Amino acid sequence: MQRSPLEKASVVSKLFFSWTRPILRKGYRQRLELSDIYQIPSVDSADNLSEKLEREWDRELASKKNPKLINALRRCFFWRFMFYGIFLYLGEVTKAVQPLLLGRIIASYDPDNKEERSIAIYLGIGLCLLFIVRTLLLHPAIFGLHHIGMQMRIAMFSLIYKKTLKLSSRVLDKISIGQLVSLLSNNLNKFDEGLALAHFVWIAPLQVALLMGLIWELLQASAFCGLGFLIVLALFQAGLGRMMMKYRDQRAGKISERLVITSEMIENIQSVKAYCWEEAMEKMIENLRQTELKLTRKAAYVRYFNSSAFFFSGFFVVFLSVLPYALIKGIILRKIFTTISFCIVLRMAVTRQFPWAVQTWYDSLGAINKIQDFLQKQEYKTLEYNLTTTEVVMENVTAFWEEGFGELFEKAKQNNNNRKTSNGDDSLFFSNFSLLGTPVLKDINFKIERGQLLAVAGSTGAGKTSLLMVIMGELEPSEGKIKHSGRISFCSQFSWIMPGTIKENIIFGVSYDEYRYRSVIKACQLEEDISKFAEKDNIVLGEGGITLSGGQRARISLARAVYKDADLYLLDSPFGYLDVLTEKEIFESCVCKLMANKTRILVTSKMEHLKKADKILILHEGSSYFYGTFSELQNLQPDFSSKLMGCDSFDQFSAERRNSILTETLHRFSLEGDAPVSWTETKKQSFKQTGEFGEKRKNSILNPINSIRKFSIVQKTPLQMNGIEEDSDEPLERRLSLVPDSEQGEAILPRISVISTGPTLQARRRQSVLNLMTHSVNQGQNIHRKTTASTRKVSLAPQANLTELDIYSRRLSQETGLEISEEINEEDLKECFFDDMESIPAVTTWNTYLRYITVHKSLIFVLIWCLVIFLAEVAASLVVLWLLGNTPLQDKGNSTHSRNNSYAVIITSTSSYYVFYIYVGVADTLLAMGFFRGLPLVHTLITVSKILHHKMLHSVLQAPMSTLNTLKAGGILNRFSKDIAILDDLLPLTIFDFIQLLLIVIGAIAVVAVLQPYIFVATVPVIVAFIMLRAYFLQTSQQLKQLESEGRSPIFTHLVTSLKGLWTLRAFGRQPYFETLFHKALNLHTANWFLYLSTLRWFQMRIEMIFVIFFIAVTFISILTTGEGEGRVGIILTLAMNIMSTLQWAVNSSIDVDSLMRSVSRVFKFIDMPTEGKPTKSTKPYKNGQLSKVMIIENSHVKKDDIWPSGGQMTVKDLTAKYTEGGNAILENISFSISPGQRVGLLGRTGSGKSTLLSAFLRLLNTEGEIQIDGVSWDSITLQQWRKAFGVIPQKVFIFSGTFRKNLDPYEQWSDQEIWKVADEVGLRSVIEQFPGKLDFVLVDGGCVLSHGHKQLMCLARSVLSKAKILLLDEPSAHLDPVTYQIIRRTLKQAFADCTVILCEHRIEAMLECQQFLVIEENKVRQYDSIQKLLNERSLFRQAISPSDRVKLFPHRNSSKCKSKPQIAALKEETEEEVQDTRL
């Protein structure tokens, strides 16, 4: 970054923001890069600001029992805040004084006041000076307040992040990750730009008092009639706002449903294509879209009328103020013009500025209180360690994850001791206490000496990870003692990679030792992987190590733990993603040899690991089931297998294990509906979601999907609703900002169940930060991100004498920005927090505008209505001229004095009724036209949005995977959420606003040109200057916004990265380093945002300066060229003020339109995506008929002669596959053939291309070569026909939000009887019957109420219903319990006995049933032989299989044609043989 010119800028340069000219000039000429951005001033650095606020907050904590964050902020920022507030007040006072001088100028042309004619020129100079002073006061004040708000946000950003790193794990389990992001985004955004409106809470009342005093001087008591009307108007608009919220509430659920389905479709687009569900998904989403649009139109109409009422209230404010006085005393023209000017300022203060200021304070104080509560949360407490001890001891340890259970436990235990039963059965205590809450660990005891290896085993949810957390101090025990030295190293179950190089991830801040580093690299089998990278171990890894395979990430995490020189190493299932050979080698070389002299605790379920452990601890439901050596364990083998492997009965697994204790969240998102009653705190806390048994817990704005959260961008709105706090809006040009906009907006995604069309369970686990820390993005689970946008409230036309601050305030109510929703993307935040710069130009092209307005055929009607708008505005102006020019009446007190000039109008009591009827008639006509004239345009543009959404959805569903693979899932979802929301809500009214403003300016200029042609000459260069200035600024501002958007991503990426690795951070003591990285990310964003604010203020000030110059010219031309008669001068000066304020607003509005049209450009880019190819070969005959008669089996009654495929024979010739067109080949020259009904197993190391081959079979990749099924080539039929030949059980399970029936049969082809029959076959009947509604039960959040095994059974049922002849299985047993795994094996043998099966699997016993094996290595086929040949050779399969399994295969060695029998024996049936529960 470059050094900022601000450091050397003069006072004048700072006052006029001239120091920004170099960046504006550079941005206009070329594309800006990050290196072009200026460094931030030292006063804005996150280090300085956070240190300052943290010091004051610590002082507050130390000095008071009830510390207040507002006091710490006051001591840091109050005086500067008030300093700029005084400037703002003085600027507003000048606006209130301007009508006085205008009235004096008009009065100086009264023939009765000729003595004042000589001072008219001085009055004009004074009026112009007021405009100049206002400009010099307002702009620095607004910028200063923005600057203070930015500093407050930065300081609190840092304070919250530091606190997050200190929070206890118990607290983290209560806080949603989205709540943390909400703290760092929408709550803090209230300070950034909304701070400029905060002062109006005291400025507006003073201004109203001043204005009412001035109007009283003119009109006496009738002045309060206008004020009363404004108050009634404010209440009326509040009523319309509530009506609008009602529609938005209804609409929010529909938007939520649509985005849930859309998100699931995008995240599982490969599965959608594999199942041929494109049409079903499109129909489902479009149906939801139709209902949503009905409510969108209603909300838009109410919002439109609300805005129209505000604009056209100007007629009635003046009318009600002037009429009573005119009826009683009569009124002169000077008073009319002066009253109009006063009423415009008064209306803005009463109906806009004061309500916004109150709302800003309400929201800001609410946000401060939330942050204050968060900063007082319980912190992580380090245990007191004995640095001299060499052993690890745990005595009688009991622990709870639920906060407060420890105290409750002690009390309950004491009561139990006081009421001991006669038989002294202590177990009764635990069974009774489980009614209140279940401890995650119960009475755990063990002792291991230095250098020993303790293996911890147990079923899912048994408390293995919790045991390690107790040792680390992350989980504070309720009772018992822990003893160890405190020098700990930790390897998490789910690998955590921080952004940085491989070396930085392994060293992790520890001093570098070359020999130790090389030894660790070798022991963890990383040498070969590192050698493949050009940068070796200096290659930079992205967030989460997204460029690495799961096995590579796991080995790097293990290497990090091993590299640290510690006394105790805690290894939480570190081998989960490794193939069997790599696992064996690492366990031997690393755990057993390299760490032989260290104390190790290894969580594992592998028998070979238990055999080599010095001590074994088996946990079951939190209790110590066994502790001892392996030889002692063998005596308990019959019962031991169920505790170690979780092989309980199916009913128990499905009913109880899914609803176990709280720590089951360490494995997956679970259901609490039928769990034991949980204890909850009675006091409601800001960041704790509690619930009672039988009640549904509150969910975050975005419902979690399968325990994987994604960031979301939500278009923000104002009124607090369902826990969504209101934000202050921002200039619309800043899209995807940290500072969201809002006014009278909506909560798009309320905390409701996303699907409400069927019964749902009563309770549901909420996703917490703890879940984020304990889940991996590589589990193949559904991920979800849901976004949407709100609507805005628009003033349809500006008022005369609007200042830039008025316009700014109105913009705060009109444009809607983006906030980060309460649920977070933990996989790839960049895709959600900014859109790729792509090829979209900085300024929207004319081609985009033309294409947009020609989408709908009703454009001609829109153009006609635009003409009506123009005619209405001109007619209004002409009526005013007619009233002023053709009513030569006399005053009561001057009836004998005639007027020589027709413009010197005096309204008397005799003529007042006549004028009254004319005025009311004109007002009613314009009001009616104003209420309805914009509706056709709004209606048409919403229809355009509907059409574009349909086209984009169809395009995405039909796009090839090679194209979709180049796009980020978050980027695609943003098109359907953020951009469609803009097209629905913002763009129609913004376009109408701009068209109306432009026509108002044209009409006013026409009137002025009639009255004074010289002014028209001055207007033309001003308009040209505005257009040129806009074009000059727009080029740079759009680029700065993009850079700011990109700079926002690392902040939230770093937050989630830190949370995911928080246990590792604490174990290694790396919190200060990560705080420094967070500050760097903040400073990067600040540099972009501060520069954008500065250039925006430069632009607004230049517009104001042009207006001042124009007004000076108009004032002196009017004064010097006008003869006697006050009417002409009043009209000219009033219209001149209206022209320039309107033109100023029109320029800003045009920038808004350009920004919004970028969303249209992005939508068009998706619509123009290529579609999947059609058959490239001519239709070939098939059997005795034509291929056109060939049918895919979709019905069991199809005649055998017509079905295809009939046998399932596959022939693959020279198959080459690529993920993207022009990319590297993932598979090269693959050739083999499969006989009908044969079972083929795919073998290969992690990343060898097994899953890729299955995708290539489905034509999901860019492929070359040929595949034939039963003689039919894939080039000769459509993709739909080809893919329906396959049944698929993918690695990534796809359960969309909908009923069981919809998930099994989205096309509604099968009857209930047939579905129940298949459900019975695959073991799903007992699962489905548990739920209310059975097949009509609505699954939400990716089927969160189902275990992973049940989801796999759903996929299996889909394949059975498809009656496909070829079945593709991609690691179906991954993360399955043994019971569900056995069900899948049984179903495969029964339902697919005559089908061709291609299996990619890690479990040895599953592969033993295959007759042929395809070994893939280095993207090519290395071997394709029967199991007998592979066993005779030194193949990968022979290395992986155990001798015991080879013995089982001997009976089949001589008959390769026979189908192998399943050779799986339960663990309890094996005595001395080694159990191979490992992966290939």
UniProtKB/Swiss-Prot annotation:
Effect of mutating residue 560 to T: In CF; impairs maturation and trafficking to the cell membrane; decrease in channel activity
Phenotype upon changing residue 346 to P: In CF; dominant mutation but mild phenotype
Chain spans, region Interaction with GORASP2: 1386-1480
Impact when changing residue 148 to T: In CF; uncertain significance; loss of bicarbonate transport; decreased inhibition of epithelial sodium channel (ENaC), when tested in a heterologous system; no effect on protein maturation, subcellular location at the plasma membrane, nor on chloride channel activity
Consequence of substituting residue 628 to R: In CF; impaired maturation of glycan chains
Positions where Phosphoserine occurs in the chain: 549, 660, 670, 686, 700, 712, 737, 753, 768, 790, 795, 813, 1444, 1456
Subcellular location: Apical cell membrane; Early endosome membrane; Cell membrane; Recycling endosome membrane
Effect of residue 443 to Y: In CBAVD; uncertain significance
Motif (PDZ-binding): 1478-1480
Effect of residue 206 to W: In CF and CBAVD
Positions carrying Phosphothreonine: 717
Subunit structure, interactors included: Monomer; does not require oligomerization for channel activity. May form oligomers in the membrane. Interacts with SLC26A3, SLC26A6 and SHANK2. Interacts with NHERF1 and MYO6. Interacts (via C-terminus) with GOPC (via PDZ domain); this promotes CFTR internalization and thereby decreases channel activity. Interacts with SLC4A7 through NHERF1. Found in a complex with MYO5B and RAB11A. Interacts with ANO1. Interacts with SLC26A8. Interacts with AHCYL1; the interaction increases CFTR activity. Interacts with CSE1L.
Disease: Cystic fibrosis: A common generalized disorder of the exocrine glands which impairs clearance of secretions in a variety of organs. It is characterized by the triad of chronic bronchopulmonary disease (with recurrent respiratory infections), pancreatic insufficiency (which leads to malabsorption and growth retardation) and elevated sweat electrolytes. It is the most common genetic disease in Caucasians, with a prevalence of about 1 in 2'000 live births. Inheritance is autosomal recessive. Congenital bilateral absence of the vas deferens: An autosomal recessive disease characterized by vas deferens aplasia resulting in azoospermia and male infertility. CBAVD may occur in isolation or as a manifestation of cystic fibrosis.
Protein name per the record: Cystic fibrosis transmembrane conductance regulator
Lineage, uppermost ranks: Eukaryota, Metazoa, Chordata, Craniata, Vertebrata
Gene name per UniProt: CFTR
